[in-house]
């Protein structure tokens, strides 16, 4: 009967019907059609007893519905069948996180990473547990809504999700050498497909924004600190003291994610060096790091558009801070990067300070 049911669902496609079934269940799960996903998974698990992948997905679906007893039953059974499966270990981590047991969640995250070092998803959960509060995109959206900037520039737009937060009447410019926008650019957005160095060499932001200074900037480009240093210097000259510059990826989770030769999807690079540099050599600036997942969000205020210190001393500053090893952060990383709590009341106070 189950074979007939599955064949009726998926037909003859030259692949095992259970593979099509699992694919359908995963799509339903991703679309939050959880009850439908469970019906398909029930049939699959009855048809193919002891199928760990189906048990993991059903456990994750039960977890999404808040049915934790059933979720743990499936995930425990899957774990017994596939103790070294990274996805299974990760879903167990998420389940424990949802129950508030961060210790067990972190243990399963570590096990998932050991099982598959290239599996980056557990890093996101580790970061969320470490920081708490809203993820950086939600914080960025709050900042846009609070500041209502007239002008906004974003360096490193990738798929354009954060650029979309700049809504009319904000004039927005996005810069990225290879933008991969998920949606067409909005009428109030202009996208320049070039490196930030090339953009600033060819364009005057004062002209681009019709004489209006930069109210808000978000630096999220190349994950090497010298690029972020130049981006900051180039943006600051078009700001006012009341402007705000945000810097992504400035609070690394650990040495591995802070490597200069890292790669997405979870890679902060050495942007942390820019925060240290600004705090040391530009004490006139108000520099803080919001502890928001996955890799922190720098917030810089009290900008000085007349300062040329960073550009005039670029090479020696790069040399000085490239020589600073990550181990320097081992003692009091929160203090050295001026970490502040990831709660909106704290962030709003920083945005209101002159």
Language-model segment annotations:
Residues 2-17, 21-39, 43-47, 57-64, ...:
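A short alpha-helical cap/connector motif
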